[in-house]
């Protein structure tokens, strides 16, 4: 009897540098690729039509790539703890290979599933692949987790990397008569404009990586914060989120001399740092890492939250960020920080509201990175910015969108506003508003808060929380 093993794809929708797939091929005579449309994730708190659509289209690409190598991707819908054991029984598989997950839900799911499979005589085997170094292997000298980025990066860089694996030429599937390529379930359309979402699938992701390494990475240190430079960042975040690209391969191919490559690699390390934090401190999904701010008194202002989410705050750089999010399912990282600071500090709304809003729309939405970024900006997380650092949206706009190109693209009401006024259009005279064909307070909102006053309110609230925690 030939040995049969399942290669269960999850957040690793690729064939290149896929340790779990390679291990499956080495361990069994017959390999059955599987993808589960997990009903728990599709309907969870952080569910996103944009992310689900991108995933579905990437699964379609994976199915085609597997078929070219002689294997048929099987697809099931349901809870993994129920459908995977049933599928293993149906196919006669004795092993299930997966890429190790680091998120709390994934870890719980895999523990439960391993027990259920074991009861049926099936072994579940996990391999690395989502990160260059696993979240639990980068530790201090005394074996503790890091809570500060810089020493984490030094320890991360000191670890030896495994070799990058080639994609398999052939995958030994079942006999021809037993092959079955399942239809891919339909999902709701994305809420973002499809034309603004990067092409899904591993092949397109590899093209993006090649283009970035050829044209952009060397200048990254200078361009990464420029909101008006669409080619200033890699736009690989959704590819990392769904494992269309291996982070190890990205780092290996980006290695080299130059500040741009060093800074770019540092962003990959930030992703791994936040996964490390979530692995060791899963409570951060429900509460601030900095316990001193657990009692921070936040505002209850649904109207302000809606204005922020809709890009109607009256601060053009904030509104451009939020409109980019809704229109494209993506936001430039600098714009994410500006919008997050405005919600958490100017509006003094709980950062978890913003965290959830981002996850509803981001095609690249990653639980660890999104939580880490929000807590960093809100000054409640690991290695955060100081609580008294509050972004001034006008100054941020002038610095990172000096000519207003980013604002004009996403806030077209302000397209004719002169550069000197683009980041504070409320200062225009009536005649200037007429010339710019925009009436502040009618066509475009006046600021919903006064930044200097909001800053003082936030400082007082954070200081009071620290005193109360002592």
Indicate where each model-derived feature is located.
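Trp/Phe/Arg-rich N-terminal binding region typifying the photolyase-homology
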Residues: 1-164, 260, 460-465, 469
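Alpha-helical packing segments of well-folded alpha/beta enzyme cores
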Residues: 20, 58, 62, 205-212, ...
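Glycine/tryptophan-enriched, flexible segments
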Residues: 122, 143-293, 400-401, 405-470
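Active-site-proximal binding-pocket segments
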Residues: 231-419
């Amino acid at each position: 009897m030939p040995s049969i093993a399942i290669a269960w794809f999850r957040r690793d929708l690729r064939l290149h540098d896929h340790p779990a797939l390679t291990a499956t091929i080495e361990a069994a005579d017959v390999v059955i690729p599987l993808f589960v449309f997990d009903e728990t994730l599709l309907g969870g708190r952080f569910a996103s039509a944009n992310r689900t659509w991108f995933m579905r289209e990437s699964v379609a690409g994976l199915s085609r790539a597997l078929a070219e190598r002689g294997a048929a991707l099987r697809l099931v819908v349901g809870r993994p703890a129920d459908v995977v054991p049933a599928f293993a029984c149906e196919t006669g598989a004795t092993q299930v290979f997966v890429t190790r997950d680091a998120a709390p839900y994934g870890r719980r799911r895999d523990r439960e599933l391993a027990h259920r499979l074991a009861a049926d005589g099936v072994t579940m085997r996990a391999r690395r692949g989502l990160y260059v170094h696993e979240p639990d292997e980068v530790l201090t000298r005394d074996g503790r987790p890091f809570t500060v980025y810089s020493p984490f990066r030094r320890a991360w860089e000191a670890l030896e990397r495994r070799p990058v694996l080639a994609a398999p030429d052939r995958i030994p599937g079942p006999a021809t008569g037993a092959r079955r390529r399942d239809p891919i379930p339909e999902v709701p359309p994305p809420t973002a404009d499809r034309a603004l979402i990067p092409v899904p699938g591993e092949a397109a992701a590899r093209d993006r990586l090649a283009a970035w390494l050829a044209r952009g990475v060397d200048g990254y240190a200078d361009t990464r914060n420029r909101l008006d430079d669409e080619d200033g960042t890699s736009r690989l975040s959704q590819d990392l989120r769904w494992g269309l690209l291996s982070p190890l391969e990205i780092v290996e191919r980006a290695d080299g001399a130059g500040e741009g490559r060093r800074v770019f690699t540092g962003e990959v390390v930030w992703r791994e740092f936040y996964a490390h934090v979530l692995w060791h401190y899963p409570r951060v999904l429900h509460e601030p890492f900095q316990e001193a701010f657990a009692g921070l008194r936040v505002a209850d202002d649904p109207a302000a939250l809606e204005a922020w989410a809709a890009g109607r705050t009256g601060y053009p750089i904030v509104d451009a960020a939020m409109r980019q999010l809704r229109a494209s399912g993506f936001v430039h990282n600098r714009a994410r920080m500006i919008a997050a600071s405005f919600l958490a500090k100017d509006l003094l709304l709980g950062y978890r509201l913003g965290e959830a809003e981002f996850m509803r729309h981001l095609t690249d939405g990653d639980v660890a990175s999104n939580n880490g970024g929000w807590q960093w900006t809100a000054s409640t997380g690991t290695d955060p910015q100081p609580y008294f650092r509050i972004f001034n949206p006008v100054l941020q706009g002038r610095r990172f969108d000096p000519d207003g190109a980013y604002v004009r693209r996403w806030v077209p009401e302000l397209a004719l506003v002169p550069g000197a006024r683009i980041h504070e259009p409320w200062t225009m005279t009536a005649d200037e508003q007429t010339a710019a064909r925009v009436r502040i307070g009618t066509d475009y909102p006046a600021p919903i808060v006064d930044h200097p006053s909001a800053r003082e309110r936030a400082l007082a609230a954070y200081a009071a929380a620290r005193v109360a925690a002592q």
